[in-house]
Amino acid sequence: MQPLRFLVLSPSGIKLDQAIISAQVKTTNGYLGLNYNRAPLIAAVQSHFCKILFANNTRRNAIIGAGLVLIKKTEAKIFTENFVFEDEIDLEATLKRKAELERQMNHSKDLKLNIKIEQNLMFELLKLSNKQR
Protein backbone atom coordinates (compact mmCIF):
# COMPACT_ATOMS: atom_id res chain seq x y z
CA MET A 1 0.00 0.00 0.00
CA GLN A 2 1.29 3.46 -0.93
CA PRO A 3 2.03 5.78 2.01
CA LEU A 4 0.33 9.15 2.42
CA ARG A 5 2.28 12.19 3.57
CA PHE A 6 0.57 13.35 6.79
CA LEU A 7 1.24 16.79 8.21
CA VAL A 8 -0.14 18.41 11.35
CA LEU A 9 0.54 22.13 11.29
CA SER A 10 0.00 24.67 14.06
CA PRO A 11 0.89 28.31 14.65
CA SER A 12 3.85 27.09 16.71
CA GLY A 13 5.22 24.97 13.85
CA ILE A 14 5.04 21.53 12.26
CA LYS A 15 3.82 19.00 14.83
CA LEU A 16 4.01 15.97 12.54
CA ASP A 17 5.36 15.30 9.06
CA GLN A 18 5.51 11.57 8.35
CA ALA A 19 4.38 8.92 5.90
CA ILE A 20 1.31 7.01 7.06
CA ILE A 21 -0.80 4.14 5.81
CA SER A 22 -3.99 5.38 7.48
CA ALA A 23 -5.47 7.68 10.12
CA GLN A 24 -8.96 8.44 11.39
CA VAL A 25 -10.05 12.07 11.51
CA LYS A 26 -13.30 13.30 13.05
CA THR A 27 -14.99 15.95 10.93
CA THR A 28 -18.26 17.77 11.55
CA ASN A 29 -19.95 15.13 9.35
CA GLY A 30 -18.43 12.08 11.08
CA TYR A 31 -15.21 10.09 10.92
CA LEU A 32 -13.06 10.12 7.82
CA GLY A 33 -10.35 7.61 6.94
CA LEU A 34 -7.17 9.06 5.49
CA ASN A 35 -5.17 6.98 3.04
CA TYR A 36 -3.30 7.30 -0.25
CA ASN A 37 -5.19 8.27 -3.44
CA ARG A 38 -8.21 9.71 -1.64
CA ALA A 39 -10.45 12.20 -3.43
CA PRO A 40 -9.53 15.82 -2.62
CA LEU A 41 -11.47 17.29 0.28
CA ILE A 42 -11.49 20.21 2.70
CA ALA A 43 -13.38 19.72 5.97
CA ALA A 44 -13.68 21.12 9.48
CA VAL A 45 -12.11 18.89 12.13
CA GLN A 46 -13.51 18.44 15.63
CA SER A 47 -11.37 17.70 18.67
CA HIS A 48 -10.91 13.95 18.75
CA PHE A 49 -8.85 10.88 19.56
CA CYS A 50 -6.98 9.75 16.42
CA LYS A 51 -5.44 6.36 15.59
CA ILE A 52 -2.49 6.56 13.19
CA LEU A 53 -0.80 3.68 11.33
CA PHE A 54 2.60 4.80 10.09
CA ALA A 55 4.33 3.54 6.93
CA ASN A 56 6.77 1.51 9.08
CA ASN A 57 3.72 -0.36 10.51
CA THR A 58 3.93 1.24 13.96
CA ARG A 59 0.75 2.56 15.53
CA ARG A 60 0.39 5.66 17.67
CA ASN A 61 -2.61 7.36 19.13
CA ALA A 62 -2.93 11.13 19.23
CA ILE A 63 -5.36 13.79 20.31
CA ILE A 64 -6.07 16.44 17.71
CA GLY A 65 -7.79 19.73 18.47
CA ALA A 66 -10.40 21.46 16.34
CA GLY A 67 -9.15 22.74 13.01
CA LEU A 68 -9.22 22.13 9.28
CA VAL A 69 -8.13 19.17 7.14
CA LEU A 70 -6.98 19.52 3.53
CA ILE A 71 -6.74 16.23 1.65
CA LYS A 72 -5.02 15.65 -1.69
CA LYS A 73 -4.18 12.35 -3.42
CA THR A 74 -0.68 12.11 -1.95
CA GLU A 75 -0.91 14.15 1.26
CA ALA A 76 -3.20 15.27 4.05
CA LYS A 77 -2.68 18.39 6.14
CA ILE A 78 -4.41 19.22 9.39
CA PHE A 79 -4.27 22.81 10.59
CA THR A 80 -4.88 22.96 14.35
CA GLU A 81 -3.59 24.68 17.46
CA ASN A 82 -3.57 21.50 19.53
CA PHE A 83 -1.92 18.14 18.86
CA VAL A 84 -0.28 15.65 21.20
CA PHE A 85 0.60 11.97 21.04
CA GLU A 86 -1.11 9.88 23.71
CA ASP A 87 2.18 8.69 25.19
CA GLU A 88 3.43 12.28 25.59
CA ILE A 89 0.55 13.57 27.73
CA ASP A 90 1.68 15.12 31.02
CA LEU A 91 -1.20 14.52 33.46
CA GLU A 92 -0.14 17.15 35.99
CA ALA A 93 0.33 19.87 33.36
CA THR A 94 -3.01 18.94 31.78
CA LEU A 95 -4.84 19.27 35.11
CA LYS A 96 -3.24 22.69 35.70
CA ARG A 97 -4.15 23.86 32.19
CA LYS A 98 -7.75 22.64 32.65
CA ALA A 99 -8.11 24.54 35.94
CA GLU A 100 -6.69 27.70 34.36
CA LEU A 101 -9.05 27.48 31.37
CA GLU A 102 -12.05 26.96 33.67
CA ARG A 103 -11.01 30.01 35.70
CA GLN A 104 -10.67 32.09 32.53
CA MET A 105 -14.09 30.99 31.31
CA ASN A 106 -15.74 31.97 34.59
CA HIS A 107 -14.25 35.47 34.42
CA SER A 108 -14.60 36.21 30.71
CA LYS A 109 -17.49 38.16 29.21
CA ASP A 110 -16.09 38.08 25.65
CA LEU A 111 -18.00 35.61 23.44
CA LYS A 112 -15.12 35.08 20.96
CA LEU A 113 -12.69 34.48 23.80
CA ASN A 114 -15.10 32.03 25.44
CA ILE A 115 -15.35 30.01 22.22
CA LYS A 116 -11.55 29.82 22.06
CA ILE A 117 -11.37 28.82 25.73
CA GLU A 118 -14.05 26.13 25.20
CA GLN A 119 -12.08 24.61 22.30
CA ASN A 120 -8.90 24.49 24.38
CA LEU A 121 -10.81 23.09 27.36
CA MET A 122 -12.29 20.35 25.16
CA PHE A 123 -8.76 19.39 24.09
CA GLU A 124 -7.59 19.19 27.72
CA LEU A 125 -10.63 17.08 28.67
CA LEU A 126 -9.89 14.68 25.80
CA LYS A 127 -6.34 14.32 27.09
CA LEU A 128 -7.63 13.57 30.59
CA SER A 129 -10.26 11.08 29.42
CA ASN A 130 -7.62 9.30 27.36
CA LYS A 131 -5.23 9.05 30.31
CA GLN A 132 -7.97 7.49 32.47
CA ARG A 133 -8.49 4.60 30.02
Swiss-Prot record:
It is found in: Cell membrane. It holds the Pfam family ATP-synt_DE_N. SUPFAM superfamilies: Epsilon subunit of F1F0-ATP synthase N-terminal domain. Its main location: membrane. GO terms for cellular component: plasma membrane; proton-transporting ATP synthase complex. It is a peripheral membrane protein. The keyword Ribosomal protein does not apply. F-type ATPases have 2 components, CF(1) - the catalytic core - and CF(0) - the membrane proton channel. CF(1) has five subunits: alpha(3), beta(3), gamma(1), delta(1), epsilon(1). CF(0) has three main subunits: a, b and c. Belongs to the ATPase epsilon chain family. This is ATP synthase epsilon chain. It comes from Mycoplasma pneumoniae (strain ATCC 29342 / M129 / Subtype 1) (Mycoplasmoides pneumoniae). The gene is atpC.
